[in-house]
Amino acid sequence: MKNAELLTAPIGLFDSGVGGTTIWKEINALMPNENTLFLADNKNAPYGEKTKEEIIALCDANTQFLLNHNAKIIVVACNTGTTNAIAYLRDKYKQVPFIGIEPAIKPAGLQSITKKIGVLATRRTLTSDLFAKTSEHLKQEEKIEIIEQVGEGLVDLIEAGQMESAEMTALLQKYLQPMVAEGIDYLVLGCTHYPYLLPQIQRLIPTSIKVIDSGYAVARQTRNILVQYHLLNENQDYVATHKWVTNGNLEILKQFAAYKDEKKHSIEVLKI
């Protein structure tokens, strides 16, 4: 592609489902004139209970789809995908920069007063080498106690649009109360789906506990890399186009992809 075409090529994002839309919102807020292409692999969600080999294969297929549609940068908008597959992707696809997502345990740990933080994430994220390396450093060097909790079942309910269901509330109570009892003062949402549960989570924990995720940091890093590679579209008059693609439930993705400012943005939701 020519330089002008590269500038308007889309930022590619993929996730195991709709969770990565939380990352898309941060990227769009920071860079509203960038085209985007979001792939929701709903058919294979959740990734958190799959083997590392399965996750790598799915992330590889997602990457190929985005590259076939001329993505200029790829955001792995999935914690499980990042912690298990991003090293493989960067090694295989050296022609394109990748942005990954890790649970924000480092900033949480460094800001914690009680030196106790909670992490709610998928099983595969919590057992990954990347998470183990970061958490071990915090434990050894900063003397931070990390209380880990697998959010089993949460992604399935979010994908089904049941964020406010009684079943969701029961699961959140089950997962959050032990961490609260341990005296955490930070709760890290270690899955891009989980920010959609923020209202429910805040109702179930003391107001003194701060809840953080990686969304804004990922958007900022994406912008930094686009600048570094001279790929940032700085034309403030450019009207961006956003395309959303799923291999699963079209109606669910439409709910999460909804954007209010239709005059400035064109959103296309397709089923592949």
State the predicted function of each range.
Residues 1-272:
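Non-catalytic structural scaffold of enzyme domains
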